[in-house]
């Protein structure tokens, strides 16, 4: 019996034949919501849940064979998924947060196209979300892991205000682009 100690990747967990407590019926319920915010203590499986949602929304039906969600989901639609993981950076460094977001945006723009008129992070992200819907015919799914790390790294420092403004613009995109 293999226990998934520190395994945060759903595909690795399933294909590696690790012990898995099937709660995919709850994942199915969660996926029916338009917007969902989950806040849990450290080491509570948030990253694995994000990975599970990513596999679900990218239509990886084979990973869910024999699990509860396999009986519930009929369509297995593949959505454009934008996974953002802020866990890896040191956001106390100036420009680290903007560099991280710009790198993510650059990858997505290569996939879905860019618009030279979109110069700000929020405009670029909004354009990518709209372009992904136009190209796939499906609304985008945005999954964010460690959403608060860029702020936790800089509490009480000069960088705090800069990171707050960057995140405000970035997260503000969701309200503007809700229909995409």
Regions found by a protein language model. Give the residues of each.
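Phosphate-binding site recognition
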Residues: 1-180
